[in-house]
Amino acid sequence: MISRHVARLLTLLCLLLATPSLSMAAESITDSPRRPIRSTDRRLRALLEEGLRISPTLRALVARLHASDVVVYLQCDGPGGPDGRLTFVSSVAGFRYVVVRMGRFARMQQIAMMAHELQHAVEIADTPAIVDGPSLVREYQRIGYVNQRSSLPGVAFDTQAAVRTGEQVLKELMLENASY
């Protein structure tokens, strides 16, 4: 009888140790070892965390990137920088690396711009043929349009999906803000 009780207790203990705790399960995807989104900018990391708490759309984008081979580096430029721009960096060891550079905006607009650019990263994740800058341009000529309003040098592309995503995340943030 005692040995059966001890065996059950040991089994329960093993299950508890082998199963991630609720706090670990709730751990932010941006803190996971295979972080799909990285930044050295504390403000951008904090805004991403805030956006993930509030926006189901942003959470879906990050989850999709987490399941992909795309790694995104976020950077914030000073005044006069681009509103937002994704640049293909490299394909190495089974991963595709992109950099998103954004201007500095107010909190909600910054999160919405981040979502807009992360939608572009998802578009790359959904297209395995994008492996370098030229293949990125070819794909965006197919799925997007030239952004005539861009003040950046060179050709800047955009997609309706990215525009809609940024708008949707901004709506979600404004609804949450209005509930306070």
Map each language-model feature to its residues.
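Bacterial N-terminal signal peptides that target proteins for export
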Residues: M1-L10
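A metal-dependent hydrolase signature that marks the N-terminal structural subdomain at the beginning
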Residues: I2, S21-V92
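Bacterial N-terminal signal peptides
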Residues: L10-S21
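Metalloprotease/metallohydrolase-associated module, dominated by Zn2+-dependent proteases
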Residues: R53-V62, A67-F88, M108, S135-Y180
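Active-site scaffold of zinc-dependent metalloenzymes
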Residues: D77-Q109, A121-I124
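A conserved beta-strand element that flanks and buttresses the S-adenosyl-L-methionine
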Residues: M114
